[in-house]
Regions:
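Residue-level detector of well-ordered alpha-helical segments, enriched
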Residues: 322, 335, 345-353, 377, ...
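Core structural elements
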Residues: 196-208, 276, 313-337, 346-363, ...
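Basic, nucleic-acid-interacting segments
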Residues: 1-303, 320, 341-345
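Structural motif
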Residues: 8, 317-318, 340-349, 387-390, ...
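C-terminal non-catalytic interaction appendages of large macromolecular assemblies
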Residues: 150-155, 193-200, 209-212, 418-481
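Amphipathic alpha-helical core segments of compact helical bundles
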Residues: 23, 238, 333, 354-362, ...
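Strongly charged, low-complexity linkers/loops
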Residues: 369-379, 383, 389-460
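M16/insulysin-pitrilysin zinc metalloprotease superfamily fold
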Residues: 342-343, 349, 357-372, 380-385, ...
Length: 481
């Protein structure tokens, strides 16, 4: 049974806990550095290893990042907050507890708008709080040994917790993609999932359709790709549906995603909710921020993707799909806005940026870089086509030359065989019609589809340098005579 069939009888209740590793120069509570590719246990210090007598210090850069995120999601930013110890035992947690936040997080509430099935949904947040990351365990089943790399231990994280308002696995995937987009826009994390910088825990329960009652919740831990977020939740929904249809009870459980088997597998059954025995960290005093400090940080938050999307749909009349492509990164959005600011039609700008320019970057398999084709050069190119100085096809060749050579557009237009101003279109059309008398007679007798044949013949003569509109207009006029 597929997800949509299950959804006819059951409501899906999904909440996410997303961990984003912040791009700070040092760890959350020490001056120790963290970089992904360093050799194991080469970036550690007494604090990140939990050695006796080592005292933590709060990373100010992490606090600034959290304030920016709070502003981006319209959450309540607390001037006063505390850190707490979250106790659990695992080899990658050397202190026996994690420094996190409990009843006084830095960010409360807020929401994140997403698009799903071409409708806007606001995903409400419970909170976002700062904490330190754990180390990383490596299990070798052949040697029956486990190793731990403590380089990541103590790295700065922001954990984003949603309300249980996500109603479909695909929504969960889209929400996680939006979080990555937001943290990229505000420049607090590159959120590279392949490096573990964006991870997700998913809480799932099923409720009888329309009952409004929560079912028994299970949790899938450490999902590390957008595709797997959706697949893991779907797998757990299918499992819970089977249990409930067999008139059995779902048990509280912690699961992990097995990518090889394409299924979420139970790690352990929980009889009760986890008791982490939170209490305020005695080594970290309460933090109190000045209002002016918070306001300064908030003022640095740029225009966000959902702001661009609404503006472009309302003011530029672009489609949702166009807007989502153009807002996919801050650099692309700013580039598009710059092109439009040069008095280029938003529709034309959208087509050239999201279709033609993107094609060139995709061919090179490189990220968008506005310096490859400057906005002012793209404006000149679009204007040349608008004035029928060059054809759209020639424009694509000019764009490629700009992209590949970095030359000035004026130089490319002069050196290339693009200009159609010296072509006598009327003379060429007369020649084509003179050579195709039989086709002209057939056209005049009602075979109007032959217009395509004539256009093709003219384009052969002009090598496609004359605009389609001019060719059609001239041909239509001549064929009426």
């Amino acid at each position: 049974m597929n997800i949509n069939d299950i959804n006819k009888n059951w409501d899906f209740i999904i909440g996410l806990e997303i961990h984003v590793q912040l791009d700070c120069n040092s760890k959350m509570f020490s001056n120790c550095q963290y970089e992904y590719d360093n050799s194991p246990n080469s970036l550690t210090c007494p604090t990140s290893l939990g050695l006796p007598g080592a005292l933590p210090n709060v990373n100010q850069s992490a606090i600034e990042s959290a304030i920016m995120f709070g502003k981006a999601v319209n959450g309540k930013i607390s001037k006063n907050f505390t850190f707490a110890r979250k106790h659990y035992f695992y080899p990658d947690l050397p202190k026996g507890y994690q420094i996190s936040q409990f009843d006084q997080p830095i960010i409360s509430g807020g929401s994140v708008p997403i698009w799903w099935n071409e409708k806007e949904f606001k995903i409400d947040l419970t909170r976002a709080h700062l904490e330190e990351d754990a180390g990383k365990s490596f299990h070798n089943n052949d040697s029956k040994k486990s190793n731990v790399d403590y380089n990541r231990s103590g790295a700065a994280l922001i954990e984003i917790v949603t309300e249980p308002v996500i109603v479909h696995p695909e929504q969960a995937k889209i929400f996680m993609q939006r979080i990555k987009q937001i943290v990229n826009y505000i420049n607090i994390s590159n959120a590279e999932m392949e490096k573990g910088k964006l991870r997700c825990d998913a809480n799932i329960s099923l409720s009888k359709k329309g009952s409004g009652k929560f079912g028994v919740k299970t949790e899938i831990k450490n999902i590390n790709s957008f595709r797997n977020v959706q697949k893991a939740i779907e797998s757990e929904i299918i499992r819970q549906n089977k249990i409930l249809n067999d008139r059995k009870e779902v048990q509280q459980a912690t699961l992990t995603w097995n990518n090889d088997k394409n299924v979420a597998e139970i790690m352990r059954i929980k009889e009760n909710a986890d008791d982490y025995r939170y209490f305020p960290d005695p080594d970290l005093p309460p933090v109190s921020l000045e209002k002016s400090f918070i306001e300064d940080i908030k003022s640095s938050v740029p225009i966000l993707p959902f702001d661009y999307e609404k503006k472009w749909m309302n003011e530029y009349n672009l489609s949702l799909n166009e807007c989502m492509i153009l807002s996919s990164s801050k650099d692309i959005a700013k580039y598009f806005e710059e092109v439009v600011s040069l008095d280029v039609s938003p529709k034309k700008a959208s087509t050239w940026v999201s279709t033609e320019l993107f094609r060139l970057f995709n061919e090179m398999n490189t990220a968008f870089d506005s310096s490859k084709v400057e906005a002012k050069d793209l404006k000149i190119l679009i204007d040349e086509i608008k004035r029928n100085k060059i054809t759209p096809n020639s424009g694509k060749e000019v764009l490629r030359a700009l992209f590949e050579t970095g030359k000035n557009i004026s130089e490319i237009l002069k050196s290339g065989d693009f200009d159609s101003s010296d072509i006598n279109t009327t003379e060429i059309i007369d020649k084509v019609l003179s050579n195709c008398q039989n086709e002209v007679l057939r056209y005049k007798k009602g075979e109007e589809k032959l217009i395509g044949f004539f256009i093709g013949q003219v384009n052969k003569e002009t090598k496609g340098k004359v605009s389609h509109e001019i060719v059609i207009a001239e041909l239509s006029k001549k064929l009426k005579d």
